From Swiss-Prot:
Residues 89-97 are annotated as: Complementarity-determining-3. SMART domains: IG (SM00409), IGv (SM00406). One of its GO terms (biological process) is adaptive immune response. Disulfide bonds join 23-88. This chain was isolated from myeloma proteins that bind beta(2-1)-fructofuranosyl moieties (inulin). It comes from the Eukaryota. Residues 24-34 are annotated as: Complementarity-determining-1. InterPro entries: Ig-like_dom, Ig-like_dom_sf, Ig-like_fold, Ig_sub, Ig_V-set, IgV_Light_Chain. SUPFAM superfamilies: Immunoglobulin. PROSITE patterns: IG_LIKE. GO terms for cellular component: immunoglobulin complex. This is Ig kappa chain V-V region EPC 109. It comes from Mus musculus (Mouse). Residues 1-23 are annotated as: Framework-1.
Length: 108
């Protein structure tokens, strides 16, 4: 199975900050990767598909990049509404696999 190693598992940042999280695939090529945002009690929301394509309606402060088998999600100019858990999903190889998630919290 392709393991998706996501880091960091938690992240504390201030409003206006730029934050980046990473998913690394343990193997495989041409991996199709999505990024999701999930808030407590809510269904996951698709942010980015194809590693870097922004889903319609998602603010442009979100961006995704691919570096071989490494994938990043960056949020620029962090807003209150961005505090959530983020996770990646590879859907190129069965079984499809998720990263462990990154919980983003506001720095006190």
């Amino acid at each position: 199975d392709v393991q998706m190693i996501q880091s960091p598992s938690s992240l504390s940042a201030s409003l206006g900050d730029i934050v980046t999280m990473t998913c690394q695939a343990s193997q495989g090529t041409n991996i199709n990767l999505n990024w999701f945002q999930q808030k407590p009690g809510k269904a996951p929301k698709l942010l980015i598909y194809g590693a870097s394509i922004l889903e319609a309606g998602v603010p442009s402060r979100f961006s995704g990049r691919r570096y071989g088998t490494d994938f990043t999600l960056t949020i620029s100019s962090l807003e209150d509404e961005d505090m959530a858990t983020y996770f990646c999903l590879q859907h190129s190889y069965l079984p499809y696999t998720f990263g462990g998630g990154t919980k983003l919290e506001k720095k006190r």
